[in-house]
Amino acid sequence: MQTHLLILAAVVLLIIHIVNNFLIKPLQTLLKSRRLGCGPVPFEPTRWPLDIDTIRRSLKADKEQRTPDFVAGRFETMGRYTWGLSLLGTSNLITAEPRNVQALLATQFDDFIMGTARRTNLKTALGRSIFAVDGKAWHRARETMRPIFSRENVSRLELLEEHVQTMLQIIETKDEGLTTDANDRAWSAPVSLAVLLPRLTMDSATELFLGQSTHSLKKALARQQQKSGNEEHDADSFDHAFERMLAILGTRMRLRSLYWLYGNKELQKCINALHAFVDSAIDAADQARKSGSSQLRYDFLETLRTRCSDRAEVREQVLGLLAAGRDTTASLTAWVFYCLVRNPRVYKKLRDTVLAEFGPYSTNPGQKITFEKLKGCTYLQHVLNETLRLHSVVPFNSRCAARDTTLPVGGGPDGSMPVFVPKGTEVNFSTHVLHRRKDLWGEDADEFVPERWEKKRPGMTWQYVPFNGGPRICIGQQFALTEAGYVLVRMVQRYDVIEGLDIDVERDWHNFTVVCSPGSPVARDAAVMCRLRVAVE
């Protein structure tokens, strides 16, 4: 008898759940939507239950290094810039409308949060850092980070120069070193800039922020000089662990609420390796502080110690800082060269501009290259802007509705009506699609044309959001632009021609983890393969 009652109770609860979720809630949503003057959005058709086929296609696109274009193709199929999709039993929205992006990031900032699934996934590795928290915890983390990205620290380009010189040594001593052509001009061996640039930015970021560099470029140079032939990272190195952590987190983000099914063991191994390095940096900083030998202008670790509840939180904040200071810069710089090898006209014009502004290459640039001069070099800034327009470091982002709210446009037959967003709905937005809309950017929106930045269009602010916007705008924005600009100047000073060796004229290739970097039809992890000709001034 008792068993029968339990079964009956379970059946009744199941019926109540079904009626509530598939009848009452949709009806309440419809009535509230109409009351607010909102219109419906079309939903992407699905073939498999719970839209599992979308996840399958997304993972396939990632494997084929075409995730941003895969998403753009879905927008084209839907025929509008705001639409819905049902995924794993939940209704989500996706948009590439400037007004909706503005609402998500700024004007309706308090209506949206990171969302539980995304926050919990990132928290596994980044804990209580700025990327994995909302509300007061986010505000506190951002205020802790703000001083490290001050103009004074961003302007410390002399620290970067040492690492640039090491990278140039690697380029010019790879394999048999420089070789000469029929015109007696010196060329480098084939080299992947997408491999070298993340090492450069990690080495400089760890030195600037922690006072202790990872020196991954110096280690690579030593291996090269020893003719070991082994260009792989040490499996336990900080640099390798950081790369693998990002790759795993990227895949887990595409699995959404099922993120916990993938990569747990390897992710934890990576986190342990990263924590070991951070602990050694903390100990070294403590020792330098006690002996009075610390070279840090702003002791970020000491600030963390006073603001964080324990050593574990210090580690988490450091990893968040390195994610902000390393990945944005590395991805941007790699994409710049990805574009330049495909556009020799732009490379020549940029080089002529750089030589006029900063002079020819010298191993000791002194004060010729400064924060102010980089900002004032107009064509250099246009090249950076155009690169970020075509190849956003983060081509997709998302927010979750913290309460019942609306988006300004996208509903109704022509998409001009507001859209009702029930509490808990995830809203995805694609900067990749937004930045390539021909109705906003012209018929040449898919082409690399830095000159388009000579004139600003009305309303451009929310048509162009490579670093997001509003209160959560990327805190490392100026750091990334300054460091990328510096590296670009030094490279075009040194090399007058760059020859791409993995160019595919048919399509772009994207290596998408948590951030998006160039991919390659030859080798995903060795993109922007090129030869460089040493300049003779």
From Swiss-Prot:
Q: What is its EC number?
A: 1.-.-.-
Q: Where does heme bind?
A: 474
**Where is it located?**
Membrane
Which co-factors does it depend on? heme
Q: Which Pfam families match?
A: p450
Tell me the enzyme class.
oxidoreductase
Q: Which GO terms describe its molecular function?
A: heme binding; iron ion binding; monooxygenase activity; oxidoreductase activity, acting on paired donors, with incorporation or reduction of molecular oxygen
The record's annotation in CDD domains points to:
CYP52
Entry's SUPFAM superfamilies? Cytochrome P450 (SSF48264)
One cellular component (GO) term of this entry: membrane
Q: In which pathway does it act?
A: Secondary metabolite biosynthesis
> How does the protein associate with the membrane?
Single-pass membrane protein
What are the transmembrane regions? Answer: 4-24
InterPro entries named in the record: Cyt_P450, Cyt_P450_CS, Cyt_P450_E_CYP52_fungi, Cyt_P450_E_grp-I, Cyt_P450_sf
Q: Which UniProt keywords apply?
A: Heme, Iron, Membrane, Metal-binding, Monooxygenase, Oxidoreductase, Transmembrane, Transmembrane helix
Give the protein family.
Belongs to the cytochrome P450 family.
* Known role: Cytochrome P450 monooxygenase; part of the gene cluster that mediates the biosynthesis of alternapyrone derivatives. Alternapyrone is a decaketide with octa-methylation from methionine on every C2 unit except the third unit. All the domains in the polyketide synthase alt5 are apparently involved in alternapyrone synthesis, that is, the 8 CMeT, 7 KR, 7 DH, and 4 ER reactions in the 9 KS-mediated condensation steps required for alternapyrone synthesis.
Name the chain's protein.
Cytochrome P450 monooxygenase alt2
